[in-house]
A protein has these predicted regions:
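Conserved catalytic core of the tyrosine transesterase superfamily
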Residues: 1-239
Length: 239
């Protein structure tokens, strides 16, 4: 049975997927969001995220300031929590948003960096396609952006999800609802290249994994592994 923290992390990761897709935030900004939210949930010491009240948030913000965090950092943290609870209230049908009517510290904070089209292009071009892992990552990024998938949807694709002839991918979304998404010529081309030149070298004889995108151990990619790779490419591409 999943722990309270595990369930909270699941909600956090789904939220991060959503804002990356909807807002196009840079990997560094997304990492900061996630760190803010995970730190808060660790501080809660097992309290359910849906049980959090305004008083809990005020106590946490006070704790941060007493620990020496700057007003700028605390304002950013509150911004992360506000966005997260807007998502959670909609996701879990909660009536009361605990971040409502909480004022940010007076000092301003810089706006999160949003990826431009050039940034996205640089990120997609960052993997070394002469390497099987890099070729896999290039195909994943092409599919992610061409189809507008969440990371969780991307890593859950299997070989039967792709219809090469029709050029579509079958995606299992929220509530186990399926949808067909056109791949586009570029993404389809990279999937074909990955399947022909890289996937076989990543598969392991004694592991029969039908996942489309395999890790170097021949198993399905995890969200954590994908984000680690993205952060590396973001540094390489300077985005």
């Amino acid at each position: 049975m999943a722990s309270t923290l595990d369930r909270s992390i699941h909600h956090i990761d789904n939220f991060i997927d959503l804002i990356w897709l909807e807002k196009g935030l840079s990997p560094n900004t997304l990492s900061a969001y996630r760190q803010d939210l995970v730190s808060f949930n660790l501080w809660l010491k097992g309290k359910e995220i849906e049980a959090v009240k305004k008083a809990d948030l005020l106590d946490y913000l006070s704790f941060r300031l007493k620990e020496g965090y700057s007003s700028r950092s605390t304002a950013r943290c509150l911004s992360s929590l506000r966005a997260f609870y807007n998502y959670i209230c909609a996701e879990l049908n909660l009536a009361d948003n605990p971040t409502a009517k909480i004022d940010s510290p007076k000092q301003g904070h810089t706006l999160p960096k949003v990826l431009s089209e050039d940034d996205v292009e640089a990120l997609i071009l960052a993997p070394n396609i002469d390497d099987p892992i890099g070729l896999r990552d290039r195909a994943m990024l092409e599919v992610l952006y061409a189809c507008g998938l969440r990371v969780s949807e991307l890593i859950n694709l299997n070989l039967l999800s792709i219809n090469i002839r029709q050029g579509v991918v079958r995606v299992m979304g929220k509530g186990k609802k399926e949808r067909l998404v056109p791949l586009g010529e570029e993404a389809l081309s990279w999937i074909n290249k990955y399947l022909e030149e890289a996937r076989t070298s990543l598969s392991v004889d004694n592991i029969n994994d039908s996942a489309l995108f395999l890790s170097k151990r021949g198993k399905a990619m995890t969200r954590q592994t994908f984000w680690y790779r993205i952060k590396e490419y973001a540094l390489k591409a300077d985005v």
